[in-house]
Amino acid sequence: MSEEKKTIYELLEADIMNSNLPEAEKAAKLSRLIQVRSKQVNIMLVGATGSGKSSTINAMFDMNVAKVGVGVDPETSIISKFDLDNLVIWDTPGLGDGVERDKEITREIIEKLSELGEDGKPLIDLVVVILDSSSKDLGTSYELINNVLVPALGSEAEKRIIIGLNQADVAMKGKHWNKEENKPDDVLKNFLKEKAKSVRARIKEGTGLDLEPICYCAGYSEDGEEQCKPYNLTKLLHAIIQNIPREKRLALVDNINTDKDNWSYDDEEEDYKEDTKKDIFDSVFDCMLEGAEAGSELGGKLLGIPGRIIGGVLGGVVGSVVGVIDSLLGD
């Protein structure tokens, strides 16, 4: 029987318990860890029918452990809820299938965005708007952003909305996509840049917000066989982590899809994997390790990474995170 996978919180707890820190400092760190562990991330995905919300969710997160449910009132809610313990995904129905249906969906989106969590803050931390990069008619999505999301989120809209341009592989009807290397050629790459530039300008014109769209491909399968691997998913994940509160970033670590192929291809404009690790480290430092004694050695070797390699202040706790992130996204 295989050993049950430990959560990032359990690994961090073990690191602290096995450290040479004074007992009082251990207790303080464990208390802080309990606070961090209680934080839950809520992400909402919205978009037109066929934009690829479900494929994006499945590509990014480990949905095998998701508990499927609905909103507070199962009788009336049409927004699907996927509960992955510290991460909750709210998947809204696709827009564009009828005026009355769209009104019903937007009404529920507004209601959900107005909900408050137990801490009195907005329940939804982030809204990811998925657009179809191959579509010339994005009017429904612009209406959603301009007339629903921005008014509902108010002054926090710019930091709580991410725009994803999915289906980059078929943006030019399947042309100029290098299947062997799983990336666009220069022609398609320029097309996608212009598409993103156009969407960005249109949103800024309508709302005043400067939101940079991320072109990506969630990947897909047909008849059980994979037809296209994900592309630029690392860039989208990095954007999500950057835009959720720092104290909640650890919640994503346990729920990242473990298929390394999903994180193997991107535009290489930045090292998104390394940037993601740094953002997670910031979260660990902010939430747990303020004031750690220089030279404290937490954990010795965990997941094959010596604590002192990272440095005395962060020690093996960050080593834990390094190991987990590397095992998921690759070195």
Task: Please identify what each model-predicted range represents.
Residues G330-D331:
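Extended, hydrophobic alpha-helical membrane-active domains that insert into or remodel lipid bilayers
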Residues K278-S327:
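Small-residue-enriched transmembrane alpha-helices
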